[in-house]
Amino acid sequence: MGAVLDRNSRFFVGIQMRRLCIMEYDFAIIYFGLTRSVRMTYESHKQRVFDVMKAANLSYKTFMHTWKTKDGTQNIWEKVIPQKIDYEEYKLLSPDFYALDDEDEFLESVNMDNYFYKDVWATIGHSKSGEWLPKLISNYICMLESQKRGFHMVRDCVMKGDKFKFVMFIRPDITIHNDLPVAAITANPDMVHIPNHSHYEGINDQFTVLNYEQACIHGRRIDELAEFRKHNGRIVAEKYCKFIITKYGMKMNEIDLQYTITRP
């Protein structure tokens, strides 16, 4: 007959077993937004990100948040395209954690008047002193919310005891052309790592690596978007990314990561 544990002993063993389940990882990799073209991009992610990390003995967990739309409809810029969303192709990236939410349901909860000023659009239109295209604004809000929900998946793991040194935000629809420069990232844990291209009106926001504390800000920046629009003119993705990085005094490290967005 095995040993019988008293109440205090059972409590101690339970704590020890929970500690055994706690893991420390180098990276949390968050995929966000519509998957769109994963069947054409996933091999580059495997070769240029996952294999590179494994070769460098870096540990990671992958998280994906994406949306479902009415009838699987998707668009490029403001144009609806005939290709429907394939809700199974995400499996090619093998995320450890996956969430699919209703985009239309989310948008119904958003007051677009806080982000897109119709009077400015009517008088000035699409320009730096006017507004961004209305469909791009709604797309961007969905992207930011997807980042937030993806980050909350990571946060849930942290609340259960897991730890992550870095958090990577990455679009699933990019084809990556060179190896992720992991040495440049891990050698600078207090910097925000951004590709050295596609900054436009601010800072590239399609791929970002930050430490966990910085990711708590960056991953939830949608919460400050309406206030930004009040005081800083029209919303543009790169412009707002630069605003947040500057506001919170984050130092940027431009890394050599070349990629192209792959359309369906």
Model-inferred region functions:
Residues 10-22:
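Short, Lys/Arg-enriched N-terminal segments with co-localized hydrophobic residues
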Residues 6-8:
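Intrinsic-disorder-associated, low-complexity terminal segments enriched in Asp/Asn/His/Tyr and depleted
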